[in-house]
């Protein structure tokens, strides 16, 4: 349903904008103020956020967005969660279901824009890699189907919002921690910066250079 999809994606984008705006509040904290209670966090880290991993899995990501993500074979986003825990089971279940991206491909296909059969039948538990044949279909869609194009652009809007969140997160951590190791043991700013240019819907970005 085109109109329902647009309404839901618009709401999701607005929620993402609200999340990004919260960083303004966190940035009122000075490095010394954060350091005064950082030890109490122990190894707690946003890296451990099952909800964020579940969000990424629902969208279509199957590996961490950071450096080396493309080297994996999928199903790795839940490895840091306690085996058998409700949080891990939720993330693993999301990674085993058709994602928003998979649903978008089927939506376009049903709208009369035939997607490659391999793209429609790919193993949803594995990471998606951008495909030129899919991008060719998306290019034709943008030129000939304004309504479907609006849905695709709404997906780009949300993906861009996720990128804004990542960027603001990186800069907040950099101004608060500098180059220190992250609370959860990651490389800190280095790890976060590596997540910046890994969109969830790569085909919708790559096709633009071919229009």
Residue ranges and their predicted role:
Residues 1-211:
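Surface-exposed peri-terminal alpha-helical interaction modules
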């Amino acid at each position: 349903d085109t109109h329902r999809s647009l309404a839901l994606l618009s709401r999701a984008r607005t929620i993402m904008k609200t999340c990004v705006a919260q960083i303004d509040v966190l940035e009122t904290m000075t490095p010394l103020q954060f350091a005064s209670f950082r030890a109490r966090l122990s190894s707690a880290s946003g890296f451990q956020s099952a909800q964020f991993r579940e969000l990424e899995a629902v969208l279509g990501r199957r590996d961490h967005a950071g450096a080396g993500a493309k080297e994996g074979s999928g199903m790795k986003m839940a490895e840091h969660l306690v085996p058998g825990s409700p949080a891990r089971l939720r993330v693993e279940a999301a990674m085993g279901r058709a994602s928003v991206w998979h649903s978008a491909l089927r939506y376009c296909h049903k709208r009369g824009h035939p997607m490659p059969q391999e793209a429609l039948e790919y193993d949803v538990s594995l990471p998606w890699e951008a495909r030129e044949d899919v991008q060719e279909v998306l290019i034709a869609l943008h030129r000939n189907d304004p309504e479907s194009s609006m849905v695709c652009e709404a997906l780009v809007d949300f993906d861009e919002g996720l990128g804004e969140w990542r960027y603001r997160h990186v800069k907040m951590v950099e101004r608060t921690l500098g180059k220190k190791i992250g609370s959860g043991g990651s490389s800190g700013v280095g790890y976060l910066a590596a997540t910046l240019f890994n969109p969830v819907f790569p085909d919708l970005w790559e096709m633009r250079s071919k229009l």
